[in-house]
């Protein structure tokens, strides 16, 4: 071939390569293909394990322990560091112990423990005999505790010798005996309504646990990563992640619970390179005074869910953490979204990403729909009876399609609660969808963004207000450490008026805070109907969240804004102070009992909101 022809071919090849690279960058084809391939490999791994009668995560852990031997496996404050061999031996000891108690495959054992190595030994030991733990929130007591134990259908309850746990067990001891539950103390182990239990099936957990490399690039092995867990392991995020680490050969570090003062000390002393967060944990870390320890750790990756978008860059800049892995997933396991963020701004704040292929694949599987704001039910056309699909870029409650009723295990022995999450005949006769209860949107680039938990959305002046959006704007103020936004009922007004409970920082007080500046910020960043009518200044940072570091709006919402009611639903809040923004006001001003009485009255002098 003539030189000119070769050049022509080379040019065409280069152009083709450049075009392919452009399309890949634009449509994210390689990323989507890799994600689909991972899912297929996980399914194949599970199918192979079923054929070999080894479809339990315990066998993955057993193989990891055989490979890693004396390498460090579990670190915990106040405990010796356990090797993989020691961890495996302790798990087997517990397996024999539970078998001797009469526990058999398919049964559950109640576990009421703080994070500790013993919890992991017990969990893995139960898996070794085909049983499983029923992990119970160690903050529960009284009726809620008995409810969870009864729901587990367990004959045994292993509990912590910590004084608060043991005292709560003793308080309900007679009631446990009435339901034939034997409480066994483990010595030396160092939002509304009663809880529902979402079972984590082997078919759901095994595929992800069997895959390497991990989702966010975590590295197994003696010179690999170590993940720090201070979030409760009885929650899905922490518990599943920690077990998956052990099944994958990734060592872990445990703290009994989150401690702001001990957090970075633990990361440094344990040599952790990763930690898992939930909810407001990152905000708490940022609220602490700057310290040399902010950069003395080895943490390179944090991952979890619920990290407010306005905190991503602040966290990375202050603590020198290069990677953030945000995900969205329901404990029920019907929908999972992932976003690996390394900076640069593209996709900042996203909880997941779908390229062109995944957007096509899941077009009818993950669907935003219109919700009736008054009833909270899916809106249906009076003519057809079907739901209204909303544009992805606008967003709405996400429904996840189920191929059959058996595709979701449902809540453990809670058929009524299970049925409330299922909806049929959504877009056509015979279809079946799962209600996530969460509103998300997806932009033109395929990034998914969390809008709100719909139960927390409120309607004001005919508009739906996103509590997350309002909270993010408040969180950007230099003197606000934490903001919890919700809607409150006000006499003589329809819907709910916005209220934000805030905690201050930088020595700011209600009297020194620049209320004019805050008012200007809110009015410039939010539509008028979304600007909170009321602001409640709390006494402390961190007092507005649940044990899982997620904002608990219910007590604050139920207490409302009547100053006389302060402390009736929120213990220790008697010294909180209310401020409000009446129509036409230039800034927030104190809200008094007299103001409440005027709002409640029928005179023409009643203030406008």
Curated annotation (Swiss-Prot):
Keywords: Antibiotic biosynthesis, Isomerase, Ligase. Pathway: Antibiotic biosynthesis; cephalosporin C biosynthesis. Disulfide bonds: none annotated. The keyword Ligase applies. Residues 545-570 are annotated as: Disordered. Coiled coil: none annotated. AMP binds at residues 185-196. One of its GO terms (cellular component) is lipid droplet. It holds the Pfam family AMP-binding. It catalyses: isopenicillin N = penicillin N. Its EC number is 5.1.1.17, 6.2.1.-. Gene3D superfamilies: 3.30.300.30, N-terminal domain of ligase-like. One of its GO terms (biological process) is penicillin biosynthetic process. One of its GO terms (molecular function) is long-chain fatty acid transmembrane transporter activity. It comes from the Eukaryota. Belongs to the ATP-dependent AMP-binding enzyme family. Together with cefD2, catalyzes the reversible isomerization between isopenicillin N and penicillin N. This two-component IPN epimerase system may function by two sequential steps, an activation of isopenicillin N by the acyl-CoA synthase component cefD1, followed by epimerization by the acyl-CoA racemase component cefD2. PANTHER family: ACYL-COA SYNTHETASE FAMILY PROTEIN (CEFD1), PUTATIVE (AFU_ORTHOLOGUE AFUA_6G03630)-RELATED, LONG-CHAIN FATTY ACID TRANSPORT PROTEIN. This is Isopenicillin N epimerase component 1. The lineage of its organism: Eukaryota, Fungi, Dikarya, Ascomycota, Pezizomycotina.
């Amino acid at each position: 071939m003539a030189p000119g022809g070769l050049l022509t071919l080379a040019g065409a090849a280069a152009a083709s390569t450049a075009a392919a690279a452009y399309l890949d960058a634009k449509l994210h084809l390689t990323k989507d293909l890799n994600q689909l391939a991972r899912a297929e490999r996980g399914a194949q791994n599970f199918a192979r394990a079923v054929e070999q009668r080894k479809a339990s995560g315990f066998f993955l852990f057993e193989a990891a322990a055989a490979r890693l031997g004396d390498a460090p496996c579990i670190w915990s404050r106040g405990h010796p560091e356990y090797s993989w061999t020691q961890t495996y031996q302790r798990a087997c000891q517990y397996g024999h112990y539970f078998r001797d108690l009469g526990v058999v495959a398919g049964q559950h054992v109640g576990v009421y423990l703080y994070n500790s190595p013993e919890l992991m030994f017990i969990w893995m030991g139960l898996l070794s005999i085909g049983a499983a733990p029923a992990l119970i929130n160690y903050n529960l007591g009284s009726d809620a505790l008995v409810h969870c134990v009864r729901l587990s259908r367990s004959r045994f309850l292993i509990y912590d010798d910590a004084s608060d746990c043991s005292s709560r067990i003793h308080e309900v001891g007679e009631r446990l005996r009435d339901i034939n539950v034997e409480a066994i103390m483990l010595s030396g182990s160092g939002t509304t309504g009663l809880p529902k239990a979402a079972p984590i099936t082997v078919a759901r957990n095994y595929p992800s646990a069997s895959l390497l490399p991990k989702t966010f690039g975590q590295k197994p092995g003696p010179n690999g990563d170590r993940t720090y867990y201070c979030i409760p392991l009885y929650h899905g995020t922490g518990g599943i992640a920690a077990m998956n680490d052990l099944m994958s050969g990734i060592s872990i570090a445990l703290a009994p619970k989150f401690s702001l003062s001990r957090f970075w000390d633990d990361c440094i002393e344990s040599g952790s390179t990763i930690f898992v967060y939930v909810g407001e944990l990152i905000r708490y870390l940022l609220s602490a005074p700057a310290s040399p320890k902010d950069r003395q750790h080895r943490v390179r990756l944090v991952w979890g869910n619920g990290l407010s978008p306005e905190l991503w860059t602040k966290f990375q800049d202050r603590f020198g953490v290069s990677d953030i892995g945000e995900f969205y997933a329901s404990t029920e396991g019907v929908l999972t979204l992932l976003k690996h963020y390394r900076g640069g701004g593209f996709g900042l704040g996203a909880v997941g990403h779908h390229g062109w292929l995944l957007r096509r694949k899941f077009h009818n599987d993950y669907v935003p729909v219109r919700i009736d704001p008054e009833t909270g039910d899916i809106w249906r056309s009076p003519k057809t009876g079907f739901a209204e699909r909303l544009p992805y870029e606008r967003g709405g409650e996400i429904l996840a399609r189920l191929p059959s009723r058996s595709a979701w295990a449902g809540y453990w022995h809670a058929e009524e609660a299970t049925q409330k999450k299922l909806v049929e005949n959504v877009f056509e006769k015979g279809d079946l969808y799962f209600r996530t209860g969460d509103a998300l949107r997806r932009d033109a680039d395929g990034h998914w963004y969390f809008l709100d938990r719909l139960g927390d959305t409120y309607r004001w002046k005919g508009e739906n207000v996103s509590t997350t959006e309002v909270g993010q704007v408040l969180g950007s103020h230099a003197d606000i450490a934490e903001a919890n936004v919700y809607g409150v009922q006000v006499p003589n007004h329809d819907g709910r008026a916005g209220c934000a409970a805030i905690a201050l920082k930088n020595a700011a007080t209600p009297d020194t805070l620049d209320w004019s500046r805050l008012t200007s910020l809110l009015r410039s960043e939010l539509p008028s109907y979304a600007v909170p009518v009321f602001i409640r200044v709390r006494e402390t940072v961190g007092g507005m969240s649940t044990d899982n570091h997620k904002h608990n709006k219910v007590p604050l919402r139920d207490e409302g804004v009547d100053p006389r009611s302060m402390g009736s639903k929120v213990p220790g809040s008697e010294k909180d102070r209310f401020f409000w923004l009446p129509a036409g006001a230039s800034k927030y001003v104190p809200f008094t009992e007299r103001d409440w009485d005027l709002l409640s009255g029928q005179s023409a002098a009643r203030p406008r909101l």
